[in-house]
């Protein structure tokens, strides 16, 4: 065993002062001295439990002792009588065994592959032990879940990721998926439950037993987000539901995740075999599938962007050449050829590497280097985490922990360890790039083209000398370009740019200037780009991105030239530069029905319990998607109606995620309202009004929302901290508002306006569905019924959605006096016009002035309220374009008039979108859109001016 280094020997004196009673410096072995100096986690544990230290001193941990974990845990749980004592015993058992593993790992008593096996088997033992105890307890309470034939149904648990692969790290969370075989009901209990309810309750108790922090800590952080539909899906699914999901909706990334899926516990029964057979075709295709290379490349790009965004320096998992790249290399071969080559279907990485070598898919030397690098990185990761039982992959910055790791890795000192690490990661990176890398490089022609601009950038030319490269520009534009370059250089002198940043900037600027200054609008474009560059000059990673990826630079220039709004967004949030790397996605926004799934995948990379990172991730996702929508808008690949569709679907995905996050936080604190125990869903709905309700959002639109619930009076929550059910929903709505409006470094998510709720700002933030119906029928003003025309549920349970739709239909189909309605709608519009219109003398406000968008909206709303009692089909849609179609189809409005209003409406909306992209206000010269305005005014007089 390597003697402790000098810094660690000095630290030992600090450890001596904390030794548990009965132990002295002289009474401890050299092994104990080494472990307790290395790991604060081990030291803290044996201080609390001195008997563990005595046990280790008398007999060292053995390589195969993982075979005894199940028996040891069974003994520990023998006296457990309730959930609280179960939680305590699970936590103590986990800590005791983790100390033994840390001891064996630190002293190299067991090889690194076996350490991974021990860590994984410990987690599996605790999961299965907790499940089995709780299953029996739930059966005593509610009966045994059975299928229609009376066969008892088990809870099957899929361990995902490193747990499934038997490669768990020291301080890891665990990714699980719960399933049960067949539908049915419980039998033999005090009351019957259907199987879905039984397994949901069992799953909730199991997660609590493992995940909830107590005075004894927690067992594992449990992450359930890999299950079908993520947090918005059922906690536990039947086999049939799982099969349907993976056959019909399973995504590529879910297929990759399923490669490592493994059933926990003794799993050779018929149900387990059925589940494995059902999942296998989804994971491994019968044919050779090369499409996975691009998918994995995209996933790697997402991870690289995350590293940049979160500033993850020295990360041995996610960094270039890190653990994740080795996993990606192996997965490429598994997913391309695994359907044909059974030897590639192993869940574990090292056996799969052996199979890759045996099949000659990689050179032997590459495989050998990957194996050595993997074991080196995994040992370093586990040692790093065992210092404080902390989930981290970032190398330490302090001298003590650096000395610990150098000693644990058998290096002379920290620089030697860093040198070895650098060599291993370089080997991994080389293989990765050869297999699925996509690095770009400059061509000789590009170098030659940018050479004259190198002198311009380095200020070696006088103004007259620069004339040849700027000959196509007018004199004033030429002077402006040179002034912008000079001013930018002066600005850089004020910035603390390191040598590497200067070097990258000097490589980048000649190429950037060559591209920008070849344009006729060079001065304008450069004036938009230099603020962005000034914002990132101290962040070398973003300069390197633009320097190393010429394609990204070209897209940056094109987009900034086309839109100051995009230039401003990129300057404010440089992380968006990552979106420029792939033109295939930059100009092709996410499919309208895929935003929720894309966001779910994006959020999986963020710890569920880290609220700050969750808020940041939501905002970053929104900004990236907005950029892609705007880029497609500029490129002409999205017509105006589609722009609004995308912006609306994006907003709905964000609402869904925010409600999920708020709900999770509330339930963790209070439990859920008890009326939900007997049903699926959350008893909650979010209704979108205005532009959101009408699928007509713009780039900077706020969200008009109201919140509904269906909680009866006198219902309490079922958590440890009980509160009134209606109070729960009020706090939920407040939490949602907070998550939307909290300002992070990435700004706010959306401005949310909830004043359209019953009684406006004076009313309750969340309303019961019954109270909402009563208010609409007896108290609401006509303008509130107008607003209801453009309202729809954007998040909610099916039954609440149906209830809202019924109320909306009932209100809209109520017979009204035509003259009274006409007067009230017209007077409301006149009030709005007096308040909002004609603010810009000699200008036309596209939205608020006569003949503008609001007039068209009022015409549509008036006609729906006026005629829906005769033509109930008019209530079907909430957007103006389809309402105008319905008016024509139902004989209310002449088809020619409806089409003309639709064209006018989309033309004006298109102009508003483009003004927003140019960061211009929504008004134009009075001479603009005279044809459209005249048409709208004529229609207004026809329908809303009293005869």
From Swiss-Prot:
GO MF annotation: an example: ATP binding
State the GO CC annotations: cytosol
Q: Which cofactor is essential here?
A: Mg(2+)
Q: Name one GO biological process term.
A: regulation of glutamine family amino acid metabolic process
Q: Name one Pfam family in it.
A: GlnD_UR_UTase
Listed InterPro entries: GlnE (IPR023057), GlnE_rpt_dom (IPR005190), NT_sf (IPR043519), PII_UdlTrfase/GS_AdlTrfase (IPR013546)
- The catalytic activity of this protein is classed by the Enzyme Commission as 2.7.7.89, 2.7.7.42
Record keywords, A-Z = ATP-binding, Magnesium, Multifunctional enzyme, Nucleotide-binding, Nucleotidyltransferase, Transferase
Name the reaction it catalyses.
[glutamine synthetase]-O(4)-(5'-adenylyl)-L-tyrosine + phosphate = [glutamine synthetase]-L-tyrosine + ADP; [glutamine synthetase]-L-tyrosine + ATP = [glutamine synthetase]-O(4)-(5'-adenylyl)-L-tyrosine + diphosphate
Residue ranges, annotated region (Adenylyl transferase):
450-947
Region Adenylyl removase: start-end pairs: 1-440
Q: What does this protein do?
A: Involved in the regulation of glutamine synthetase GlnA, a key enzyme in the process to assimilate ammonia. When cellular nitrogen levels are high, the C-terminal adenylyl transferase (AT) inactivates GlnA by covalent transfer of an adenylyl group from ATP to specific tyrosine residue of GlnA, thus reducing its activity. Conversely, when nitrogen levels are low, the N-terminal adenylyl removase (AR) activates GlnA by removing the adenylyl group by phosphorolysis, increasing its activity.
* Family of this protein: Belongs to the GlnE family.
NCBIfam families, per this entry? PRK11072.1
Give the protein's recorded name: Bifunctional glutamine synthetase adenylyltransferase/adenylyl-removing enzyme
Please name the source species: Salmonella agona (strain SL483)
* Designated gene of the protein: glnE
């Amino acid at each position: 065993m390597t003697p402790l280094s000098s810094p660690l020997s000095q630290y030992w004196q600090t450890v001596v002062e904390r030794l548990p009673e009965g132990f002295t410096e002289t009474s401890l072995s050299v092994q104990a001295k080494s472990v307790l100096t290395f790991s604060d986690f081990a030291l803290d544990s044996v201080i609390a439990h001195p008997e563990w230290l005595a046990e280790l001193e008398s007999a060292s941990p053995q390589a195969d002792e993982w075979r005894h974990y199940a028996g040891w845990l069974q003994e520990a749980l023998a006296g457990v009588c309730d959930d609280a004592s179960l939680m305590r015993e699970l936590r103590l058992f986990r800590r005791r065994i983790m100390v033994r593993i840390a001891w064996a790992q630190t002293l190299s008593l067991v090889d690194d592959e076996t350490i991974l096996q021990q860590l994984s088997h410990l987690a599996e033992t605790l999961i299965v032990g907790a499940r089995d105890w709780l299953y029996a307890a739930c059966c005593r309470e509610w009966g045994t879940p059975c299928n229609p034939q009376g066969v008892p149904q088990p809870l099957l648990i899929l361990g995902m990721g490193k747990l499934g692969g038997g490669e768990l790290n020291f301080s890891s969370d665990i990714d699980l998926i719960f399933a049960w075989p067949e539908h049915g009901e419980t039998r033999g209990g005090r009351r019957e439950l259907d199987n879905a309810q039984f397994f949901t309750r069992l799953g909730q108790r199991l997660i609590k037993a493992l995940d909830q922090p107590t005075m004894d800590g927690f067992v594992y952080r449990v992450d359930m987000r890999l299950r079908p539909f993520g947090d918005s899906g059922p906690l536990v699914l039947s086999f049939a539901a799982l099969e349907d999901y993976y056959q019909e909706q399973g995504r590529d990334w879910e297929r990759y995740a399923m490669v490592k899926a493994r059933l926990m516990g003794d799993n050779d029964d018929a149900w387990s075999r059925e589940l494995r057979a059902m999942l296998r075709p989804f994971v491994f295709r019968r044919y050779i599938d090369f499409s996975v290379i691009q998918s994995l490349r995209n996933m790697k790009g997402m991870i690289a962007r995350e590293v940049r965004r979160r500033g993850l320096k020295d990360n041995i998992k996610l960094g270039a050449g890190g653990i994740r790249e080795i996993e990606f290399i192996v997965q490429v071969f598994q997913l391309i050829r695994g359907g044909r080559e059974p030897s590639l279907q192993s869940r574990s990485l090292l056996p799969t590497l052996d199979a890759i070598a045996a099949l000659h898919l990689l050179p032997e030397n590459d495989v050998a280097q990957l194996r050595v690098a993997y074991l080196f990185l995994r040992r370093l990761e586990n040692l790093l985490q065992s210092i404080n039982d902390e989930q981290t992959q970032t190398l330490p910055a302090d001298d003590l922990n650096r000395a610990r790791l150098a000693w644990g890795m058998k290096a002379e000192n920290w620089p030697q360890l860093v040198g070895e690490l650098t060599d291993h990661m370089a080997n991994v990176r080389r293989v990765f790039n050869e297999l699925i890398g996509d690095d770009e490089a400059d061509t000789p022609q590009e170098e030659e083209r940018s050479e004259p601009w190198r002198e311009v950038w380095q200020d070696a030319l006088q103004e007259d000398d620069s004339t040849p490269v700027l000959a196509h520009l007018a004199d004033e534009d030429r002077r402006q370009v040179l002034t912008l370059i000079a001013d930018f250089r002066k600005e850089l002198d004020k910035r603390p740019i390191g040598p590497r940043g200067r070097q990258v900037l000097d490589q980048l600027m000649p190429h950037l200037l060559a591209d920008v200054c070849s344009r006729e609008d060079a001065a304008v474009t450069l004036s938009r780009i230099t603020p962005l560059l000034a914002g990132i000059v101290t962040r070398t990673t973003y300069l390197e991105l633009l320097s190393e990826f010429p394609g990204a630079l070209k897209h940056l220039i094109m987009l900034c030239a086309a839109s100051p709004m995009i230039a401003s967004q990129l300057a404010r949030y440089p992380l968006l530069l990552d979106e420029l790397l792939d033109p295939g996605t930059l100009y092709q926004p996410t499919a309208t029905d895929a935003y929720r799934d894309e966001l779910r995948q994006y959020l999986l990379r963020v710890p569920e319990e880290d609220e700050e990172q969750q808020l940041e991730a939501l905002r970053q996702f929104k900004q990236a998607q907005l950029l892609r929508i705007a880029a497609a808008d500029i490129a002409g690949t999205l017509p105006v109606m589609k722009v609004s569709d995308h912006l609306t679907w994006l907003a709905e995905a964000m609402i869904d995620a925010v409600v999920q996050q708020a709900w999770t936080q509330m339930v963790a604190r209070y439990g859920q309202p008890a009326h939900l125990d007997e049903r699926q869903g959350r008893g909650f709905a979010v209704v979108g009004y205005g532009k959101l309700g009408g699928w007509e959002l713009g780039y900077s639109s706020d969200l008009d929302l109201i919140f509904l619930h269906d909680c009866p009076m006198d219902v309490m929550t079922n958590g440890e901290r009980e509160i009134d059910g209606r109070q729960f929903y009020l706090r939920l709505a407040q939490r949602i508002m907070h998550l939307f409006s909290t300002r992070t470094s990435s700004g706010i998510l959306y401005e949310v306006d909830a004043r359209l709720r019953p009684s406006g700002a004076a009313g309750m933030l969340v309303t019961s569905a019954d109270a909402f119906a009563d208010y609409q029928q007896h108290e609401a003003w006509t303008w509130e019924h107008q607003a209801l025309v453009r309202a729809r549920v954007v998040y909610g349970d099916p039954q609440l959605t149906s209830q809202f739709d019924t109320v909306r239909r009932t209100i809209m189909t109520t017979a009204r006096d035509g003259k009274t309605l006409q007067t009230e709608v017209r007077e409301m519009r006149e009030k709005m016009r007096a308040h909002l219109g004609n603010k810009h003398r000699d200008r036309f406000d596209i939205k608020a002035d006569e003949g503008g968008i609001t007039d068209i909206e009022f015409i549509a709303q008036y006609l729906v309220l006026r005629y829906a009692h005769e033509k109930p089909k008019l209530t079907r849609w909430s957007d103006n374009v389809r309402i105008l179609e319905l008016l024509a189809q139902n004989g209310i409005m002449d088809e020619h008039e409806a089409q003309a209003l639709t064209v006018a409406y989309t033309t004006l909306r298109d102009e508003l979108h483009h003004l927003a992209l140019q960061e211009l206000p929504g008004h134009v010269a009075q001479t603009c859109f005279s044809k459209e305005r005249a048409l709208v005014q004529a229609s207004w007089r026809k329908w809303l001016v009293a005869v």
